[in-house]
């Protein structure tokens, strides 16, 4: 098996894990970050075969860092508002009946 096969298998496992996480937002964010890093590593492996593409790798790394910072800031704001990182608290906010 090549490295692409391993990365594809790992990506599928993380994709299934993403949809089975229902209790904690923090674990959901960790799985989402690992999916992003798997995608980044597969792009890095594919760009390794091309010459002169180091700028694309730096750009992708910047996007991954910005995505991680955004998700962490959203999680911190959510925990400050609800004092909990449980998915049940998010469901109460999103699906609350307005009178």
Curated annotation (Swiss-Prot):
One of the record's GO molecular function terms: NADH dehydrogenase (ubiquinone) activity
Keyword match Iron: no
Gene3D superfamilies registered for this protein in UniProt: 1.10.287.3510
Localization per Swiss-Prot or TrEMBL: Mitochondrion membrane
Record's keyword terms, sorted: Electron transport, Membrane, Mitochondrion, NAD, Respiratory chain, Translocase, Transmembrane, Transmembrane helix, Transport, Ubiquinone
Enzyme class: translocase
Chain segments annotated as transmembrane: 1-21, 25-45, 56-76
Keyword Protein transport annotated: no
Source organism superkingdom: Eukaryota
Chief place where the protein resides: mitochondrion
UniProt membrane topology term: Multi-pass membrane protein
Catalytic activity: a ubiquinone + NADH + 5 H(+)(in) = a ubiquinol + NAD(+) + 4 H(+)(out)
GO CC field: mitochondrial membrane
Family statement: Belongs to the complex I subunit 4L family.
Protein name (database record): NADH-ubiquinone oxidoreductase chain 4L
Lineage: Eukaryota, Metazoa, Spiralia, Lophotrochozoa, Mollusca
Gene giving rise to this polypeptide: ND4L
């Amino acid at each position: 098996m090549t490295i692409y096969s391993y990365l594809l298998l790992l990506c599928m496992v993380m994709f299934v894990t993403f949809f089975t996480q229902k209790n904690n937002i923090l674990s959901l964010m960790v799985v989402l970050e690992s999916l992003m890093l798997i995608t980044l590593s597969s792009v890095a492996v594919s760009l390794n075969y091309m010459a002169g593409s180091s700028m694309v790798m730096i750009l992708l790394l910047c996007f991954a860092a910005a995505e991680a910072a955004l998700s962490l800031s959203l999680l911190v704001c959510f925990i400050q508002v609800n004092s909990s990182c449980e998915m049940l608290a998010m469901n109460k906010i999103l699906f609350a009946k307005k009178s």
